[in-house]
């Protein structure tokens, strides 16, 4: 209502905010003729939600910003032009965009070596916008700022045109039977089911596989989806080793004040009795 009444022209929302906005029962009672630009970011957005959002706001240009507070805060932009129909649209919409003019972005391995196009490593950035350090936290500063680069903690890769693709938070990656499973990919598959409102995929201890893929799912109102049906749905969209081995349904998922999923809250009960948070 405030966006309509105040004639908001630009806004920045995290995906959870967009989802709750367009799914609100009274959303269609309002119009936003002056809303020229909607930027989104701070958390991954699945393809289904992005398509629904662009349909819900047909006269609005969309753009994605990628970065972190330590980078003041944006280092990559997926421009409005990248959201327009074209031969590369589907691929580009999976990316976080290309680096802004004052930032240099690269993909590095754990030893700080730059990786070739298409290979997954850690997203790092440098430039005049990088922080000097964390206040009175020299150890954390030394860990984040190494060899002149700010280490984001995000795993990703870069294509030949310089578009950066975020695959997961490095700490959220699941290693099951020696295979790397990126939780975002599983969440995107789950999001394709019409009964799902929101999901979080985490790794939980497993005696056989080390870790197994576990999905925590929030359903839409009046939905009756069960575990077996959702697992079979995932089997259509992703490889067998990425499919959730267990599904837990909840009425709400833990979110930060900024609307980000707090996966550490979901993981804690499963790992509390373990000596290490990897298995």
Model-inferred region functions:
Residues 3-4, 11-14, 24, 122, ...:
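AMP-binding/adenylate-forming catalytic core of the ANL superfamily
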Residues 5-13, 22-91, 104, 111-114:
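Gly/Ser/Thr-rich phosphate-binding loop
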Residues 42, 67, 97, 154, ...:
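Active-site glycine-centered loops adjacent to acidic/histidine catalytic or metal-binding residues
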Residues 44, 84-136, 144, 161:
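Adenylate-forming AMP-binding core of the ANL superfamily, especially NRPS adenylation
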Residues 63-70, 97, 202-204, 248:
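Beta-strand->loop->alpha-helix junctions that form or flank phosphate-binding loops
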Residues 104-110, 251-258:
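Active-site and channel-lining beta-strand-loop segments
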Residues 268-279:
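Acidic/polar alpha-helix N-cap and adjacent early helical turns
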């Amino acid at each position: 209502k405030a966006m309509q009444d105040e004639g908001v022209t630009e806004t920045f929302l995290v995906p959870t905010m967009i989802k709750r906005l367009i799914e609100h029962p009274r959303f269609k009672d309002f119009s936003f003729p002056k809303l020229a630009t909607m930027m989104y970011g701070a958390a991954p957005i699945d393809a289904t939600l992005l398509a629904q959002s662009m349909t819900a706001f047909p006269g609005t240009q969309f753009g994605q910003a990628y970065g972190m507070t330590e980078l003041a805060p944006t280092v990559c932009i997926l421009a409005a032009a990248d959201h327009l129909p074209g031969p590369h649209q589907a691929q580009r919409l999976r990316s976080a965009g290309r680096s802004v003019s004052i930032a240099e972005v690269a993909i590095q391995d754990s030893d700080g070596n730059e990786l070739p196009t298409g290979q997954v490593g850690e997203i790092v950035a440098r430039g005049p916008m990088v922080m000097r350090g964390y206040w009175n936290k020299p150890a954390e500063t030394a860990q984040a700022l190494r060899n002149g680069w700010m280490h984001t903690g995000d795993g990703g890769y870069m294509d030949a045109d310089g578009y950066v693709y975020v695959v997961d938070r490095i700490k959220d990656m699941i290693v099951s039977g020696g295979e790397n499973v990126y939780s975002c990919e599983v969440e995107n598959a789950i999001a394709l089911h019409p009964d799902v409102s929101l999901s979080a995929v985490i790794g939980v201890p497993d005696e056989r596989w080390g870790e197994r893929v576990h999905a925590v799912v929030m359903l839409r109102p009046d939905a009756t989806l069960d575990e077996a049906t959702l697992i079979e749905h995932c089997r259509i969209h992703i490889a067998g080793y990425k499919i959730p081995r267990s599904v837990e349904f909840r009425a709400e998922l833990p979110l930060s004040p900024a609307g980000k999923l707090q996966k550490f809250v979901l993981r804690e009960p499963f790992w509390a009795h373990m000596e290490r948070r990897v298995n």
